[in-house]
């Protein structure tokens, strides 16, 4: 509410503003204007009000045209009682340096020195530094390494899979080459191997047949084979015939016992008997002589 009413706000450029604090809710601009006009030309008196209730907020602004007049008003009116309250008058501040007013009084912030001293340990524990770890643990920053780690793991898995696949392909290719080489070797070496196998089989069959042919001769000495017979038996076929067919003298000896006693052929030496039983290839002549003598002594020859 301004003292000049509906005429609108006056031109406050190049003016000096005073702040009046601790006024009552009943005090109006008309009540303050004659009080401050005593010390100079007042340009404007303004009391801020609440927009909801319309009540006074407990302070007012008084503007002077000249600076020296404003200083006089501050010196004379500061601490005066108006409507039962002691008011405070001072130069108003605007912008970042403006005072914070609450219930008609300026809320003075703590001095800067105290702030610096009080906040010095806090600065060591400043919110930036205290909040730095949670910022590092923020979802964006925390997700970025996780995503990178996942990407890294995916790349590592892909590399491992690609390496394993390439290794499997190499192994398969090597196995195919080995199988192909084995097949080519088996095909190229098959006739030689067949010949070797056949030669071994023939040798084994021959040795087996020889062992079978030689085994009965060793087991039964009675069955004489033509290879193991003595050369005397093979060379003298006449002796075989003589042994098989006995002489007429021997055949007649049992019939005529008297002749057997008179014949000197039976009284032969053991050497002749051995010669007769085992004839040698160089003994046909004495056998013939013996036969002639026996024939001359026999009674059939005398007749």
Curated annotation (Swiss-Prot):
Basic and acidic residues compositional bias, start-end: 149-158, 165-178, 190-207
Spans annotated as Disordered: 100-303
Miscellaneous comment: The splicing pattern of the pre-mRNA is regulated in a tissue-specific manner and by development, and changes in response to various types of abiotic stresses.
Gene Ontology molecular-function annotations: mRNA binding
Disulfide bonds: none
Predominant subcellular localization, coarse grouping: nucleus
Family, similarity comment: Belongs to the splicing factor SR family. SC subfamily.
Effect of gene knockout: No effect on SCL33 alternative splicing.
Domain RRM: 16-94
Residues found modified as Phosphoserine: 7, 186, 188, 251, 253, 256, 263, 278, 280, 283, 296, 298
Identification of the protein by name: Serine/arginine-rich splicing factor SC35
A cellular component annotation (GO) from this entry: nuclear speck
SUPFAM superfamilies: RNA-binding domain, RBD
Biased composition (Basic residues): 112-148
Subunit (UniProt): Component of the spliceosome. Interacts with SNRNP35, CYP59 and RS2Z33.
Keyword Phosphoprotein: yes
Organism annotation: Arabidopsis thaliana
Cited function: Probably involved in intron recognition and spliceosome assembly, but not involved in alternative splicing regulation of the SCL33 intron.
Extent of Low complexity compositional bias: 210-226, 244-257
Regions of compositional bias (Polar residues) in chain numbering: 294-303
Localization terms from the record: Nucleus speckle
UniProt keyword terms in alphabetical order: mRNA processing, mRNA splicing, Nucleus, Phosphoprotein, RNA-binding, Spliceosome
